[in-house]
Design a protein with these regions (language model features):
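Hydrophobic core segments of beta-strands in well-ordered, beta-rich domains
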Residues: 1-9, 15-17, 28-31, 36, ...
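Acidic, glycine-rich loop-and-beta core segments that form the ion-binding/anion-interacting portion
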Residues: 51-52, 64-85
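Outer-membrane beta-barrel domain signature
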Residues: 34-35, 69, 97, 135
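Beta-rich accessory regions
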Residues: 75-203
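Asp-box/BNR beta-propeller loop motif
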Residues: 20-28, 86-90
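Short glycine-/Asp-/Thr-/Trp-enriched loop segments that recur within the blades
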Residues: 37-43, 101-104
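Conserved Ser/Thr-centered positions that define the repeating blades of beta-propeller domains
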Residues: 17-20, 148
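Short consensus segments that form the blades of beta-propeller domains
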Residues: 7-10, 68-73, 136-139
């Protein structure tokens, strides 16, 4: 099947479901979802997959309005969890949630790895803050791939384990005592860290 993001006559987002037996000739089936101006306008870059016993839908709506801390004005990436009835091609979903709260996260897509993991990668480039210098031969970048799971209806995201192959400068410290809520550790340099910390309160 193919899920095509589009917009209705009133400008609100909707998703058209197409099916094919040969990936060449396609048949339109139905509108599988419509936001009716509830979640932004045009729905872009849909992704639709089963994960941990439920059906996940990810879309990237344009021109959304902020709702407290949950969304921000402009282009967002949101997800729904729900149930999909294959026979009737009916999707029943819950409320939208933000995929990522960063302002430059857009158009996430997922793949299923050969060992069965669902991995997501997205585009880091805000359309509202296009700041690429003219002399650069590239614009934007991609996120670190994330392994996805669903827990209690929420999308859980973890960096893929393969990234550990690129770790350098490992350091280990034991029995570090915190004084005034802070401690300075020697030999730590770099811009990004992955830390595992075990904390024990003194008796």
């Amino acid at each position: 099947f193919a899920l095509i993001g589009s917009k209705a006559e009133d400008g609100s987002g909707q998703l058209a479901l197409f099916t094919s037996e040969d990936a060449i000739h396609w048949n339109y089936e139905k509108m599988i979802d419509q936001c009716k101006n509830r979640y932004g306008k045009m729905w872009e870059c849909p992704d639709f997959f089963a994960l941990d016993g439920c059906q996940v839908l990810i879309v990237s709506p344009q021109f959304m309005r902020a709702e407290g801390l949950e969304f921000h004005n402009g282009n967002n990436s949101i997800y729904f969890t729900g149930d999909y009835e294959k026979e009737t091609m009916t999707y029943t979903r819950g409320d939208a949630r933000q995929v990522d709260y960063g302002m430059d996260f857009y158009a996430p897509q997922t793949v299923e790895t050969t060992d069965g993991r669902r991995v997501m990668i997205a585009w880091l480039q805000s359309w509202d803050n296009f700041m690429t210098p003219e002399d650069m031969d590239w614009t934007g970048l991609m996120t670190i791939p994330r392994e996805l799971h669903v827990k209690d209806g929420s999308l859980v995201q973890l960096p893929v384990r393969e990234i550990e192959n690129y770790y350098t400068g490992e350091r280990s410290y034991e029995n570090v005592t915190l004084e005034n809520q802070s401690a300075e550790l020697d030999g730590i340099t770099g811009r990004s860290f992955d830390m595992t910390v075990e904390v024990k309160k003194e008796d």
